[in-house]
């Protein structure tokens, strides 16, 4: 959760550094309150709405508008995480934070959380490019072949992790490996979540 909230804060500051929600988002990202994840998400999506969409945008799997783009992007991310969990012999059915939710692979959802903002950034980039081309918000929100190619390329974006530059996909693998080490060691020390810095986009 620390990494996810921190990454959301970092991205929101890039999107709109003077947005009135930024100060509260920074504060919530480091608090110990139990509602931190939900509150950070609310603030994060308010920044997105005011920057890239419109003020009545609501993030939700079953909502309309740009939500379909985010749903598809997260499906790509989930597939990547599952691939590495299976390769490492980790059962995705046993999670940490998501075990009580309706997910079939809660561990995958746990480990993908810090990476969501990377895909959020590339979805926002897609929306920006579409609107610059004169497309309507409705057209920009369509899942086209070009969008699929654009969002899949997120996995090849160059990122920093463990003081090394690597494709985002390699960072996902490294995080899964570090989680496996933590499980085998019986302690959280070996686990290294991904922290978002500069991303050099592929595609």
Model-identified regions with their sequence ranges:
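Active-site helix-to-loop segments that bind/position phosphate- or nucleotide-bearing substrates
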Residues: 1-203
